[in-house]
Amino acid sequence: MNKTLMAAGLAVVLGACNSSKKSDGVDTSAVNPFFTEYTTPFGVPPFEQIKVEHYKPAFLKGMEEQTAEVEAIVNNPDKATFENTIVALDRSGELLMKVAYAFSGQASVNTNDEIQALEQELSPLLSKHSDDISLNPKLFARVKSVYENQAKLNLDKEQKKLLEETYKGFVRGGANLDADEQAELRKLNEQISMLELTFGQNSLKETNAFQLVVDKKEDLSGLPETLIAAAAATAKDWMESGFSHCIIRV
């Protein structure tokens, strides 16, 4: 559950001056890096291979796969258990998280107009996908059954924590609301996701537009020479004399 909700928060701005590079427009979906295993150290996304056009099909496929995984849990004829319900749900959405982590990173620190437009397009889809899981009555019934019978399950501390957080995620996500209240909650969640995204993008634009121009090197006394050199290079790029700084958000 937490992984799914995380996917809806892609617009959080982690920082830095953005890039204005655009994709080359070539359809490379046949070699989409998200559809293969990473061969990078520690599973770091191979950003040098990832194009903007790779994200949307990977997100759509990721949501499709997780929906199928959730349906398999819901339609399991066996009695709900910790393994076939809680663990299965926690392990669902692997592809969705794979692309979400990469996209949120790029959208935060190396964004452009294409990526921001894609954020606007994906945000309501991800909000709906999250709600479709959180507000699935049959899925919640299975989770609730495991939660209410946990005393019989001999769970360790980690398992108990996962069960508790999963159950609370559903309750806080509106699983106990009636149909009308859930419909209203869906609308609010979509509005909130779009407002958060728009705020983040506007904040990033303001950050990127900021310039602090220092005319005299002595005013930078005490700063490392590497930082002073970087400021001079930034000023040169921006056609300014002296030393210029942008805001780095972390």
Q: What is each model feature region?
A:
Residues 7-15:
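Bacterial N-terminal signal peptides
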Residues 17-250:
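Zn2+-dependent metallopeptidase catalytic domains
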